[in-house]
Curated annotation (Swiss-Prot):
Pfam families: mIF3. It comes from Saccharomyces cerevisiae (strain RM11-1a) (Baker's yeast). This is Altered inheritance of mitochondria protein 23, mitochondrial. It is found in: Mitochondrion. One of its GO terms (cellular component) is mitochondrion. Keywords: Mitochondrion, Transit peptide. The keyword Glycosyltransferase does not apply. Residues 1-32 form a transit peptide. Belongs to the AIM23 family. The gene is AIM23.
Length: 356
């Protein structure tokens, strides 16, 4: 058996370990490189913390953006600069005096109060037919030096919608109606301030009432319906001080959509006479007309009649003025004071008209 000395084995093992150690550890830690090594370690740890913070912030932003995408994030709406002021309807008039423009604008304002879209019906001055329109288009081309606007009727479509019937009138008449409107408005303000006696409002019906009401009546109406329903409707309007115009025509014509345009020709003289009706039909129409005269005799002045019973008729009614009792001296004094104020107002308006 081969015998190897123990000292040789130990020396070989030591040689192997030394070579292994020298192979892996080529750089030794010494005093010279201690500070630089510490700085590297410290900078590495600092960088690691910064990266960790950035990662955490990025993760939080991603989570928020995922929960609330940009297009769904609700932001407070910016309040418009003139949010409290509603958009004003403006129609530019190129003709007419300032007074004529004010009168036209007051009619336009009233139209938009009754129909916010400005839809109206107009009477064509050439064909005298009623046609639908809009005030924005209808107002274009109107010469306020010659003509003006007036609402002659209001058609109730439903609880919310109304369509005014607008007609072109002479400029002089339009200015007169606007002056009456301003006087009426001023009187109301004085009553609210207590300058005028409010009880006077219940004693006198305003003579300048511009509110004109239209009522259709068929020649074939039953006597009971005429004396009850129609009579109540007519008398109620007259008591309120409204002017009322009654339109009498055949049942088929009065219920048509363009019924009003059939009466336009009655305001002008017509040539020729309509064909004579059978005696029974004529007597029926005469009875209807006589009943209407009896109904309105107490509440209206003498009616103005146009047309004839063989075709169609118009009855124009103006309410009677309410006169105070002779023993009511205070009411009589108020009435005379009112008349003096009206005369003074007319004198002022006449002076303004002459100055224009």
């Amino acid at each position: 058996m081969l015998k190897v000395p123990l000292s040789d084995v130990l020396s070989q093992k030591m040689l192997f370990l030394k070579s292994f150690r020298y192979f892996h550890c080529t750089k030794y830690f010494s005093r010279d490189n201690a500070s630089s090594t510490t700085d590297i370690f410290r900078n590495a740890m600092k960088r690691k913390r910064e990266l960790a913070n950035l990662k955490e912030q990025s993760h939080g932003n991603v989570a928020r953006n995922a929960a609330f995408p940009k297009e769904y994030i609700k932001r407070p709406k910016q309040v418009p600069r003139n949010a409290t002021n509603r958009k004003k309807i403006l129609i530019t008039w190129s003709t007419g005096t300032d007074r004529a423009k004010e009168a036209a604008n007051s009619v336009v304002s009233e139209i938009f109060k009754k129909n916010h879209k400005g839809n109206i019906k107009v009477v064509d001055p050439t064909t005298h037919r009623i046609e639908p329109s809009n005030i924005r288009y209808f107002a274009k081309g109107i010469d306020l030096d010659k003509v003006g606007l007036s609402i002659v009727n209001v058609e109730q479509i439903d609880n919310e919608n109304q369509i005014p019937l607008v007609k072109i009138i002479e400029s002089r008449v339009a200015l007169k109606k606007y002056s009456d409107f301003l006087a009426k408005k001023k009187e109301k303000e004085l009553m609210e301030l207590g300058v005028l006696n409010k009880s006077y409002k219940n004693l006198v019906t305003d003579k300048k009432e511009d509110n004109l009401k239209h009522i259709k009546i068929s020649w074939q109406i039953e006597s009971d319906d005429l004396k009850r329903q129609k009579a109540h409707e007519i008398v109620s309007l007259l008591k309120k001080g409204n002017k009322v115009t009654l339109y009498l025509d055949d049942k088929n014509n009065i219920n048509s959509n363009n019924w009003l345009e059939n009466f336009e020709e009655l305001d002008r003289s017509q040539k020729g006479e309509p064909p004579r009706l059978p005696e029974s039909v004529f007597q029926k129409r005469a009875a209807v007309l006589e009943t209407l005269k009896e109904i309105v005799s107490e509440y209206a002045n003498d009616p103005v009649l146009l047309g004839n019973m063989n075709s169609k008729m118009i009855m124009k009614l103006i309410p009677k003025d309410v006169k105070p009792q002779n023993n009511d001296k205070r009411a009589l004094k108020e009435l005379r004071k009112k008349e003096r104020q009206e005369k003074l107002q007319k004198r002022i308006q006449r002076k303004k008209m002459n100055e224009m």
